[in-house]
Amino acid sequence: MKIQELIGTIEVVRIVGDTNKEVTDIQFDSRRVGEGSLFVAQVGTAADGHEYIAQCVAKGAVAVVLEKEEYIGEEDVCYILVKNSDEALGKMAHYWYGEPSKKMKLVGVTGTNGKTTTATLLYKLFKELGYQVGLLSTVVNYVDDE
């Protein structure tokens, strides 16, 4: 997928570089970046992803999504400046994987008593009917059988 297609899903402040390059994957962990990666620099509680941009470029990243303008380099890499890297990552990942949430049906269970029982019964019913199902509750979390 081309950078320009992928970033069409996010709010961009500024672009420096060629957006016509092919992206092989999206990474937010600098240790997993390889040739063709788009690296998303996120500010965390223990580390700042912006500190790893140079390392990612050296490993072959073709694009970097970042919040801090001072980290934009001179390399032949596309830098995409955004206000919120976390939000940009979520939107790009959603698009990258074919917008899966648009294909999902969601059932919410609210009330005072019986929510877990009702949700579990619905999970088992839909599973028996052959649907791919998930269950998120305060007791268990399942995606299909796992």
Question: Where are each of the predicted segments found?
Answer:
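N-terminal leader/targeting and accessory segments in enzymes
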Residues: 1-91
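Phosphate-binding loop of NTP-binding sites
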Residues: 7, 87-146
